[in-house]
Regions:
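Compositionally biased linear targeting/interaction segments
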Residues: 1-118
Length: 118
């Protein structure tokens, strides 16, 4: 079963990330075997409306880097992109992050649900 310890790990990851966009994210918890995840997946529901997102046009490097899916270098690259001559403080489309060498397609897919543009 899950038990108190593993339940606490799930809650901790959910809190740190700002919610889950996929039940498959539970596989990121090292101390919970895939066999247990496979058993509980049918009972898990995900509420995308409750995801906590970060506005990339108004967040500092420190705030961006606070998210576990964003490295310091990625946070700095987002900030620098926002303030380059073309953007003048405003990124218009999240997909622009794919033009940064700091973001692989995989990195972007993992983090995009936690980012927003206001």
């Amino acid at each position: 079963g899950i038990g108190k310890g593993r339940a606490a790990m799930i809650v901790n990851l959910r809190t740190t990330l700002g919610g889950f966009y996929s039940a498959e994210q539970l596989r990121e918890i090292e101390n919970i075997p895939d066999s247990i995840i496979d058993k509980i997946l049918p009972y898990i529901t995900i509420e995308l409306d409750s995801l906590k997102t970060i506005d990339i046009n108004h967040s500092s490097i420190k705030r961006l880097h606070k998210h576990p899916y964003i490295s310091y270098y990625q946070a700095r690259a987002i900030y620098n992109l926002r303030w380059d001559k073309k953007h003048k403080g405003r990124i218009e489309n999240l997909e622009e992050l794919l033009n940064l060498k700091e973001f692989s397609k995989e990195d972007f897919e993992k983090v995009k649900n936690y980012l927003r543009i206001n």
